[in-house]
């Protein structure tokens, strides 16, 4: 049985965007499902645009998403001698030829074709030259067949066929000696034994040229699966104007990697009506044949909903660790306050991102917050002073300070004073948190502890007395 080998081959000319991440994810899932090998290859033949910073960003994005690779990263820039060797093989076998046409001549041919109403393509001027022209600059072209059909069965799109007379004699080596993309990708996939190529559907038109190269070199043609692109809400191709498109930007906005993975895989693939998938679920259930043929529309609200789910159901200890940098960005030392895991537990239910959780946690670590003006007008009236005094006295005399015992004290005060719970809880919440929107007041008090709770109640009492 042939070993299953898949690859993700990004160009390091920018960050890892969500479209590339989804392609990587589909390749990774199929490799893991079929117990195959997942290879990372960096396509950096465009030396002018490729940067180490982009390579680092791609690797960081892959690692954050948990898409581990079995081989690589391989760099095309390290393989130029290999490509030259294969160019020479094609020249020696007559399957490639040197083209001496100048850029000006080619442009004139193109303009003439357009004037004649023909599709611009190389006219084969140098295809049958008898010999070399020493010292004259040249490119190397692949001698494509002019008759017949090149077809393949795309795992997503089905049967796709191209008439060979529509295909150009592809340039495989530029005049400066560097190889072209369509050539090197075939050499890499062939020599690395890639069995399935999953990539964006903007590569469909490259596929017949690449298949002809495989056949000319005597290598087996891999299976192809062309994934539809991702669109914004306006049905235009997803870009920066639609919001964040970089994977690490979502990390910095407080998203969890499992939420983005879950969202991206569902953007084009489905398994019944299920919405929530762990990585283990995905490996078991994923099928490239179940990826839809139409473009997926990126829905930030759906991603936010998924992220909220993963925060709500996440391990508080892990979330606490992830929350630390967000707190530090806000000038908070998480070691200088209540237990962070306990803090997280009170915020999981209502936080949609780690950024929201960090903002919601600030009151735990700061006493110098100001009170919400509307809340002050409504709740911090002179009549609330005896209530604060009673809470302080009851907490001081209570040996136990759990959320259950705190709740019992609130109930006692309500019964004694003939008040509703909100009439006691809201002034207390303002004293402890600065406003009326906060987690359960009983849990907040337990996390802050008796001493800090009473300090904040006394501060609020002094505020009310000052009027």
UniProtKB/Swiss-Prot annotation:
Keywords: Aminoacyl-tRNA synthetase, ATP-binding, Cytoplasm, Ligase, Metal-binding, Nucleotide-binding, Protein biosynthesis, Zinc. The keyword Cytoplasm applies. The keyword Isomerase does not apply. One of its GO terms (molecular function) is tRNA binding. ATP binds at residue 240. Its EC number is 6.1.1.17. A motif ('KMSKS' region) lies at residues 237-241. Gene3D superfamilies: 1.10.10.350, HUPs. Its main location: cytoplasm. It is an enzyme of class 6 (ligase). It catalyses: tRNA(Glu) + L-glutamate + ATP = L-glutamyl-tRNA(Glu) + AMP + diphosphate. InterPro entries: aa-tRNA-synth_I_cd-bd (IPR045462), aa-tRNA-synth_I_codon-bd_sub2 (IPR020751), aa-tRNA-synth_I_CS (IPR001412), aa_tRNA-synth_I_cd-bd_sf (IPR008925), Glu-tRNA-ligase_bac/mito (IPR004527), Glu/Gln-tRNA-synth (IPR000924), Glu/Gln-tRNA-synth_Ib_cat-dom (IPR020058), GluQ/Sye (IPR049940). Its cofactor is Zn(2+). Binds 1 zinc ion per subunit. GO terms for biological process: glutamyl-tRNA aminoacylation. GO terms for cellular component: cytosol. Monomer. Catalyzes the attachment of glutamate to tRNA(Glu) in a two-step reaction: glutamate is first activated by ATP to form Glu-AMP and then transferred to the acceptor end of tRNA(Glu). Belongs to the class-I aminoacyl-tRNA synthetase family. Glutamate--tRNA ligase type 1 subfamily. NCBIfam families: gltX_bact. This is Glutamate--tRNA ligase. It comes from Geotalea uraniireducens (strain Rf4) (Geobacter uraniireducens).
